[in-house]
């Protein structure tokens, strides 16, 4: 795959969607045509599964079944959108990917790491991110942001969970970033949007320069 695959990870209210939009604008200013996508979702099949997951209907079947649903959505997303875009040399910006499954289903769902690694390997079939930006913010602050962003809309099932669960996920993301420093860049998300965006642009521009694309 000849393109560049960048994923954004972090807890609720970390600002992933905002930073994806800002980075996409920056890339367009440099002549790129980035693909913006999300998980769960990003392809027709994956979006159908997204509705089942976020509605809470999947909770009935337990975390193992839910992890398989995420994996099925991811496999379709990779095959239908991500892999073809990368083959065309596009830059793909994805809101959540494998690390969210590791944190949400693996850690707080108490699923075995071997089980999670097996379904991850099948779902992505080699489509690992070139760069993962882990936006870090304490759980309480992130949930406050998410509530303000949501306004009068109903919180999804993940936002409704206890603060301790959200903090456990935060620690899971931090551990992933610590274990995979070559892929993951930890970003302090408890700052202004502009400062966060500046750091992200710097990281991405460095990679593009190294690849001779900028």
UniProtKB/Swiss-Prot annotation:
Its EC number is 2.7.4.9. It is an enzyme of class 2 (transferase). The lineage of its organism: Bacteria, Pseudomonadati, Pseudomonadota, Alphaproteobacteria, Hyphomicrobiales. InterPro entries: P-loop_NTPase, Thymidylate_kin-like_dom, Thymidylate_kin_CS, Thymidylate_kinase. SUPFAM superfamilies: P-loop containing nucleoside triphosphate hydrolases (SSF52540). One of its GO terms (cellular component) is cytosol. It catalyses: dTMP + ATP = dTDP + ADP. Belongs to the thymidylate kinase family. This is Thymidylate kinase. PROSITE patterns: THYMIDYLATE_KINASE. Coiled coil: none annotated. It comes from Brucella suis (strain ATCC 23445 / NCTC 10510). Keywords: ATP-binding, Kinase, Nucleotide biosynthesis, Nucleotide-binding, Transferase. ATP binds at residues 10-17. One of its GO terms (biological process) is dTDP biosynthetic process. Phosphorylation of dTMP to form dTDP in both de novo and salvage pathways of dTTP synthesis. NCBIfam families: DTMP_kinase. One of its GO terms (molecular function) is ATP binding. Pfam families: Thymidylate_kin (PF02223).
């Amino acid at each position: 795959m000849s393109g560049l695959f960048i994923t954004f990870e972090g807890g609720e209210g970390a600002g992933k969607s905002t930073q994806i939009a800002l980075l996409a604008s920056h890339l367009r200013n440099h002549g790129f045509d980035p693909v913006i996508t999300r998980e769960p979702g990003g392809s027709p099949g994956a979006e159908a599964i997204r509705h089942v997951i976020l509605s809470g209907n999947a909770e009935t079947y337990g975390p193992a079944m839910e992890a398989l649903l995420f994996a099925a959505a991811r496999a379709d997303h990779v095959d239908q959108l991500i892999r073809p875009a990368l083959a065309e040399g596009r830059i793909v910006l994805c809101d959540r990917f494998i690390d969210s499954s590791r944190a949400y289903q693996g850690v707080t769902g108490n699923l075995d790491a071997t089980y999670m690694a097996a379904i991850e390997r099948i779902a992505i079939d080699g489509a690992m991110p070139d760069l993962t930006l882990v936006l870090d913010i304490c759980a309480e602050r992130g949930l406050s942001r998410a509530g303000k962003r949501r306004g009068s809309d109903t919180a999804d099932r993940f936002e409704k969970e206890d603060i301790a669960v959200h903090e456990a996920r935060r620690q899971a993301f931090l551990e992933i970033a610590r274990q995979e420093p070559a892929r993951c860049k930890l970003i302090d998300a408890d700052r202004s949007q502009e400062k966060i965006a500046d750091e992200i642009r710097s990281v991405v521009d460095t990679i593009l320069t190294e690849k001779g694309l900028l």
